């Protein structure tokens, strides 16, 4: 890894150890643009020495920060409003993902970009919650048909009529179609035992909400991230988990025991091992601890998955004719799966030719079109 890329890694480390002292930047214009594209632009004005940057780039970074501050504050205030209304009818929601971890562990909460706000409530509370959403000015909106949400882990998303803030009201952590769905750790009974009262507003403990326990948060974030390859926003899973491990006391025996289920172990291992091997953690987590996770990944699996993480998440490499965004996603899902290693190597070229999730994979016209794209076009 060259000096340019090592410097980029150091910037990521500064976030997860909450070091906001500016550093002399050797980042290229393109590298900074990639960080912005990856949704990390809001923190760069704090971390980079702007004396070496062009006025245009400084203006862009200032704009990223101001936009992130405004957008986060809007989401945050509307979350407080919803929690207040739910508390009035004796419902205490559980905060999930970005809204939970940003308000507790990020050096500045607006660093954590969020497309929507995720909360979890009991199944029998859904109807009451949806009445409150309508009262507060939200309406449900989705391009997917209603039957899709009958087995989904959250109801039809809610969008505010004027402020464009989205909420997802979860009844479970994963849909029935997910490999993570049957895991014991994600069952409602376990969540209810694990969750902890932790007010989102430390200055106003009259607002009551839960957060997942730290061990469950680590496994949930890793599993949600690992099920499919996400380039844009995918880095937040690494930052989220590194902040948990660097700033809280995690019960490793509990984490390892809970993670030792099919698929869950693979997702958790590959992310935690990447953090450890690249010195994202402050020493509280060791390779020996991570290696106790009973995953099914071979050396080749781990090598390929780590290359995908490094090249497409951290360095922002462009996709190519063969390794298109769709094909990288196919390879990711294959090599992180629980299939035997030799089968993965056999299936890899087959899946590239015949995409497993495509209804047209055996359609001749579709295949001819794909082959032309692979041979003659470059895809970002």
Name each region found by the language model.
Residues 1-115, 121-380:
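Conserved NTP-donor binding/palm subdomain of two-metal-ion nucleotidyltransferases/polymerases, i.e.
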